[in-house]
Amino acid sequence: MTEDKITGTLVFAVLTAVLGSFQFGYDIGVINAPQQVIITHYRHVLGVPLDDRKAINSYAINSTEELPTGPYPGDPTPTSWAEEETTASASLIIMLWSLSVSIFAIGGMIASFFGGMLGDRLGRIKAMLVANILSLVGALLMWFSKLGPSHILIISGRGISGLYCGLISGLVPMYIGEIAPTKFRGAIGALHQLAIVTGILVSQIIGLDFLLGNHELWHILLGLSAVPAVLQSLMLFFCPESPRYLYIKLDEEAKARKSLKKLRGSDDVTKDITEMRKEREEASSEKKVSIIQLFTNSSYRQPILVALMLHMAQQFSGINGIFYYSTSIFQTAGISQPVYATIGVGAINTIFTALSVFLVEKAGRRSLFLIGMSGMFVCAIFMSVGLVLLDKLPWMSYVSMTAIFLFVSFFEIGPGPIPWFMVAEFFSQGPRPAALAMAAFSNWTCNFIIALCFQYIADFCGPYVFFLFAGVVLVFTLFTFFKVPETKGKSFEEIAAEFQKKSGSAQSPKAAVEMEFLGATETV
């Protein structure tokens, strides 16, 4: 029996898979930098005069958005929307832009239910190939959006790309988790999130106006995700299928052994086969649980509600408001080069995501989540204070910028990765697929709400917007302190007992029997 090791085939397969995660991140971040360029093009398509500089500048400042990056001479002069164009046309532009951002999350929300199903039906490799069809269609629609009704093509392309990302957000972690050696499963699994934030960072860099984020090349920037989609599709033909899928789902032991020999670089795969045989026996003795049963069964109700709250905390903390509209926020904060500050956010996001890979296995999940949320609360307060006092104290722009950087850092320490870890640890094999699907749906739904509403909230609240998010973060921090148990190193039985304790009720005999049936002696 050989020790777990990293082989060339394993590295190739993992890097191929996380190209999908990279596309996911690229699609999240790509819409930010060319924001005003795209809005200007929308105005052109809808017949609003492009030389109406005052209205453009008023829109950029009053809605906290980036000033135009196009070749407009002179200094911006803020004026009222009402003086330059009708309320209806102004609302239409805002609605179309918000929809361009948020339709991505609608696609992800819908597709998040079907990633696991597609992977089980077609296999992990074929499922990722099929998903890439959606990625290519979405990218091509956006690539050619400059030639037609741009608002329709961009919104359609973003929606289809969202469908792709909803599928891939389940398929990639599933595949790399199943091919990874036990010793490296945690680190390899974390590469999914690392590839996402790397994709965000790359989209921010090449979205600079002197690269692709300008009036001539913005459509290429949006459609560039077609490149990793084509590359991944070609590379997938050389990747071995998941041995767990072959053995546990299809009962193809010979094919599973062949796949394992390639991945492990050894003819001795007894250890993996034994582990998979045990997993298959456990899975066959455990009934599957539907999404409805998660809420109707008393054994699952408290864990699933806490799981949903953790994902709501992640999204409603305001983090995606920063990711989607960071350039606008820095513009409002008085930063002279807001796009570069946005890239700084992406770089910090990447660095602290890598750091969290090590922290999450050393410290408790609940502790890191509380530290992250508490830090975000303080940063949100300083962010708003900086924005409110900016007119009187210009140096407050640096306070706001520093607060944003720290806000992102605290997010990646705890609320970013932790909910996904904890949801998997709340549930054993039977209810886990339904719980993860419900958690993914909740995450995408909240993502959509923030993407659609953040701009309207920012318009209404002005510089006080992050006071609102500070209040939300405080509520979720208190909820975590009183209701969320620590899961690191505990069995499902111990976690279930913690939930009963925090809900203030003793475990019923029926619930105890159910938890025993669900394999409550397993340690996470």
Swiss-Prot record:
N-glycosylated; required for stability and retention at the cell surface of pancreatic beta cells. Residues 1-6, 116-126, 177-187, 240-303, 361-366, 414-433, 483-524 are cytoplasmic. It is a multi-pass membrane protein. D-glucose binds at residues 193, 314-315, 320, 349, 412, 420. The modification Phosphothreonine is found at residue 523. Gene3D superfamilies: MFS general substrate transporter like domains (1.20.1250.20). Residues 27-89, 146-150, 212-216, 328-338, 390-394, 459-463 are extracellular. One of its GO terms (cellular component) is plasma membrane. D-glucose and maltose competitively inhibit fructose transport. D-glucose, D-fructose and maltose inhibit deoxyglucose transport. It is found in: Cell membrane. Glycans are attached at residue 62. Belongs to the major facilitator superfamily. Sugar transporter (TC 2.A.1.1) family. Glucose transporter subfamily. Facilitative hexose transporter that mediates the transport of glucose, fructose and galactose. Likely mediates the bidirectional transfer of glucose across the plasma membrane of hepatocytes and is responsible for uptake of glucose by the beta cells; may comprise part of the glucose-sensing mechanism of the beta cell. May also participate with the Na(+)/glucose cotransporter in the transcellular transport of glucose in the small intestine and kidney. Also able to mediate the transport of dehydroascorbate. This is Solute carrier family 2, facilitated glucose transporter member 2.
